[in-house]
């Protein structure tokens, strides 16, 4: 009997243990971040359970309300938003919350305040619920500058100021991927234990990938560099093999695949939507943060994505993120266009 192998299998690194280990590396830590993360994890577990039994519980119909993006809200959207708002406030470690579902930011009452601001999309890709496609929760965490004088400026910061970011994908398995600024790690939910277990330690995106991910239905409205890049993916002139197109339409699922297999995920601006569709604070920033931490890049068509300074909490931006070399290629096309302008 291989006792060493058995020991490896039984020495499970849970997400709580992992975050506590990270905390021990920082002498100034008082455990606030660990408590906050445990509440985010609780929210993810609740939503995972709700997504898994959505059909049985009749949660997947439209709720009859419209969110501020003008999208019909699904019942699961509403439920997920409420769960995360309550979980984050009850942690006692948050100050300002920005949700994709709420028009205004939520300022936590002073007696329950902590030093963190959390920006999140409680259920990204919700239009895919009915057809069983993977959906997910995306979150980013900032530190408040002055706890006694918290303002919207505390969340209207560039993404490079985030202290942590992550997403939880609800699919064939429930996977939580996060970074606290020192690499990216992935955890898979074990339903028998009720715990997230470290299954993807220190994720590194391949330097170059074989996949591109974009909604080609918008191609007629694209700008020059995006059109040229996709043409290059399909019909390479250097004798290399064409890239494969993979597009699910759920950002969490598309980015998760890109992170693990390499390649590029694109949601460019176009004639119809010059700023693209993705929201800066709780979609572009967290995913860009993760990509950079995994050794990739994120670019808006004009600048590094994490250098953007949002003016409003629901601002949108184009984004190109993924393998370092693939993003370099599209950056070169934008630079050439600017030079010729």
From Swiss-Prot:
Principal location: cytoplasm
Enzyme Commission no: 3.1.3.11
Record-linked InterPro entries: FBPase_C_dom, FBPase_class-1, FBPase_N, FBPtase, Fructose_bisphosphatase_AS
UniProt xrefs under SUPFAM superfamilies: Carbohydrate phosphatase
Cellular-component GO terms for this entry: cytosol
GO molecular function: fructose 1,6-bisphosphate 1-phosphatase activity; metal ion binding
Binding-site list for Mg(2+) 1: 71, 100
CDD domains, alphabetized: FBPase
Entry's cofactor comment: Binds 3 Mg(2+) ions per subunit.
Record keywords, A-Z: Carbohydrate metabolism, Cytoplasm, Hydrolase, Magnesium, Metal-binding
Enzyme superclass (EC): hydrolase
Subcellular location: Cytoplasm
Cofactor: Mg(2+)
Residues annotated to bind Mg(2+) 3: 121, 124, 283
Residue positions binding substrate: 124-127, 215, 247, 267, 277
Catalytic activity from the UniProt record: beta-D-fructose 1,6-bisphosphate + H2O = beta-D-fructose 6-phosphate + phosphate
UniProt keyword Hydrolase present: yes
Pfam families referenced in this protein's UniProt entry, alphabetically: FBPase, FBPase_C
NCBIfam families referenced in this protein's UniProt entry, alphabetically: PRK09293.1-1
Similarity comment: Belongs to the FBPase class 1 family.
Note: In plants there are two FBPase isozymes: one in the cytosol and the other in the chloroplast.
Protein name: Fructose-1,6-bisphosphatase, cytosolic
